[in-house]
Amino acid sequence: MTDNIILEGLKSFGVEKAEDKAIVLSSYLDLVMSFNPSLKLVGEKERDEIARRHILDSASAYPVFLENTEAGDQIGDLGSGAGFPGIVLAILFPDRNFVLIDRMTRRIGFLRIVKAKLNLENVEILDKDVKDVKRNFRVITCRAFRPLAEIGDEVVALTSSAILYKAVEDNIEKELETLRFQGFVFNASILPVSIPGEKARRSIVVMKEWRKP
């Protein structure tokens, strides 16, 4: 079964082969719904609410990833949790490779189930704290993770580029200013996005040439 909410949302973001990808995302939502009562993956309980607030929210950055990444790129998802945005992006971009990083055992177990059930060959799962990861990524991403000022050193050890999901109520400019005060240099763009059916707005922060001289 395909959730119409997901399909229409993907179409609004300009996703290629939206119908096929909506089917896989609906199967992913089935797994979230099935395991959520025992694993407490997300706070919401209603299917449509999870579809909007987590799956479509994760998919909203599709145009940004399309523009800033390419086939074969390795993308790290910090604190992947239940797979938002990493699993969603892996479904939307089967030609990119996604490394999902989390240190909570129950979440890691769920991610492994999702990878197996959905045959996501472009997904790798790391059961590690971010600071212990020794890899180089084309770009990293994270959603509902820690403030930028708390992850600066960890990020620049992995990459110089990031695509970050931030709530509008987050004081993004203040977070960026704190990074500068800490000695980081970067080029940052703040892009507003909206989720069909959701009043809450989201910003995508694109960080380039992020480093600490």
Can you say where each PLM-predicted feature lies in the sequence?
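Class I SAM-dependent transferase core
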Residues: 2-76, 106-109, 113-123
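Residue-level signal for inorganic ion chemistry
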Residues: 32, 89, 207
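Conserved S-adenosyl-L-methionine
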Residues: 77-81
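Conserved SAM-binding loop of SAM-dependent methyltransferases across substrates and taxa
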Residues: 82-95
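S-adenosylmethionine
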Residues: 95-213
